[in-house]
Amino acid sequence: VREAIRDSCNIFFYEAGYRLGVDNIEKYAKEFGIGQRTGLEISESSGYLATKADKVQIRTYSTSDYIRRTVGIKGNAIITNEDGTEQAVYKSYAIAKELYSQITPDKYEYNSISQLYNRIFEEVTAIMAKYNVKDNVYLQKITQQIMDSRWVTTDTINASIGQGGNSTTPIQMANFLSSLVNGGIRREPYLVEKA
């Protein structure tokens, strides 16, 4: 591990990340403070830690935008959030949320990508028929958006080396390295005027 860190050996970390899996990468990154505010007394960004849930959320927004701008579904709707609160949203977002809550590519068993695509296309077609959307071009684009929401091996490998959707602040990285060299003890950082 020391040599891999010293040499910045991506291949070592690709393999380590692949073996760990994204859920463990997320768990350990959070333990080291990645993707969250550090507690400094100045305003700061929390950075961003790429996760399966965030990838689906990003695709939900993208699909909502496509439904509103290209398919042409306008207006507002009320959705109920996971915590039970109601929220006013674009109707297109409510439809996208419905699509992504009912169609989860990871739950299907399939022998080929085309088999998975066809299965999702059928479900998209059924849901969008409720909104009078029957144009194959629209249905195919929405199906592809859902296909693209799958977390795949390359996402895990990218996450393992801090690439992809990850974004950290310099203070998060300094705090991470400090924790690493101090045997995993994470301290809250603070600013000093003079050393």
Give residue spans per PLM region.
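Beta-lactam-recognizing serine transpeptidase/beta-lactamase-like catalytic domain environment
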Residues: 1-195
